[in-house]
From Swiss-Prot:
Positions bound to S-adenosyl-L-methionine: 273
Domain SET: 22-274
Molecular functions per Gene Ontology: protein-lysine N-methyltransferase activity
EC number: 2.1.1.-
UniProt miscellaneous comment: Present with 4800 molecules/cell in log phase SD medium.
Source organism (scientific name): Saccharomyces cerevisiae (strain ATCC 204508 / S288c)
Homology family: Belongs to the class V-like SAM-binding methyltransferase superfamily. RKM1 family.
Function recorded in the entry: S-adenosyl-L-methionine-dependent protein-lysine N-methyltransferase that monomethylates ribosomal protein S18 (RPS18A and RPS18B) at 'Lys-48' and dimethylates ribosomal protein L23 (RPL23A and RPL23B) at 'Lys-106' and 'Lys-110'.
Protein name: Ribosomal lysine N-methyltransferase 1
Main localization of the protein described in the UniProt heading: cytoplasm
Amino acid sequence: MSSDALKALLQWGASFGVIVPEELKFLYTDLKGIICVCEKDIDNPSIKIPPEIVISRNLPMKFFGLSESTKNINGWLKLFFAKIKFDRDNDTIVDNVRVNDKFKPYLDALPSRLNSPLVWNPSELKRLSSTNIGNSIHEKFEGIFKEWFELVSSSDMFDLERVADDVQTFHNLDELTYEALYEKILKITELQRPTIWYSFPAFLWSHLIFISRAFPEYVLNRNCPDNSIVLLPIVDLLNHDYRSKVKWYPENGWFCYEKIGTASQSRELSNNYGGKGNEELLSGYGFVLEDNIFDSVALKVKLPLDVVSTILETEPSLKLPLLSDYTTYAFENKDCVQQEKKATRSATDYINGVTYFINIQNEQCLEPLLDLFTYLSKAEEEDLHDLRARLQGIQMLRNALQSKLNSITGPPATDDSYAIDPYRVYCADVYTKGQKQILKEALTRLKKLEKTMLSENKHQLLTMSKILKNDPAFAETELPSLFSNEDGEEVIFESTYDLLILWILLKTKKNSYPTKYEWVGQQYTNFKQTAYISDDAKAFHTAYFEKQDDVDLAEVDHAIQFVVDNSFTRTSSTTEETILVRK
């Protein structure tokens, strides 16, 4: 936005009665764009917007002839906004007012460049290729494209022949490279050059304006449909600061913004979108914050729906959050939100997975995740507090977080295919750096928790190193005698897991458990195995006992099942180590 466009916007707002205290001044800066600065100290400064310039669902309802029951009214609002921006040949008239002329100063003042990753060029997007944002781009496009197609194909007012290329792109989206999509759609959106107002590039531009600038209509109208949104000129110039204490409220149909407390001279007056991490800020608003205390990593866990159903029915203490549990508005319908969160949930609510957010500032953020991974690790007779299940859950969660950390690679090699915007590089670097820091901190906390649990419960844990130290007969005589008929061939033991199985087989056969480890024999005797022989048992028997008859397949299967259900494996240590747990 230029200084002239800002001046014209403020004059336009004043002509409709927008109230801005004289102590506040909007300025254009090269560093931050538009800012609002206090020229003097002012207590509780407020900005008030009259209903005449609120861009709401009333406009598309009247123009398109929609009803209160029309589905996706926000989608129609985005189409309407695209029309007043890009339909240069026809006036858009509502209540005998040329809406395109009425809002021209506002339209002219909107950003000439959008920084949402949804319109980054291929070279820029490569800097996000290994992150949640980069991995979700295709899915987001698919959702926006589908919304557009359902709207334009639902009414005869849209000539689909004129947007046939966009329709074809929608149907072939899975087959297109990102480079092709950028050339066909995104470049047109980014440069704001759609030639047809109901084309997908026009709709995408409007969509990006709304996700970066919209306010909940609930502030003005408590009886509005759920999630209904509005645009509020002038107020949407204020930048975000999570430390800013503000309130939004209606006053005789006007929207009112108020800064709580004193706004100091020469300081910027800011809005507050709520606590948002850099992933949400970059995806929705096109910027990031360094040292953002609300920064988080989203970890999506996809579970079979029958597992979800069982958890919902039998494990009420397990938290399976939906995205709506995290998403809040700075001014939300609390009654509606509470009812929504109390509503009975079903497995189909989690068809896209369960999403957890990890935040360094929240000491308890890993607990729900660890509970879930413990549940997924536990044997049928165990509960969430059993030591073995808990330790195995820690291993599973560590592996998942380490895998996610490993997937976030460094900046790609220099790519000259497209010009790269330095600001977008900055945003990508801050975002990815934050993701890595959070994952590393989470892994450190899990490692510390594991170390504490291993130390406090060492009397209940049996490692192969302890066995070799306290049961020398196993390695010196029993194990060699078991394989004495191998024709001189060297027997290689693959892991401590294999050695534990062999130890249990030998100790049980010879009834030679050392006194201090007799608990293993008792635990083994009490263990009930399943009726069928597993493929793992068959493979193990073939690997070690194919040439001898001393150990039958059923014995091997029993020992394997016992070790699986009574041990955990530290796969995150330098070497995998299987450890038996006393129950």
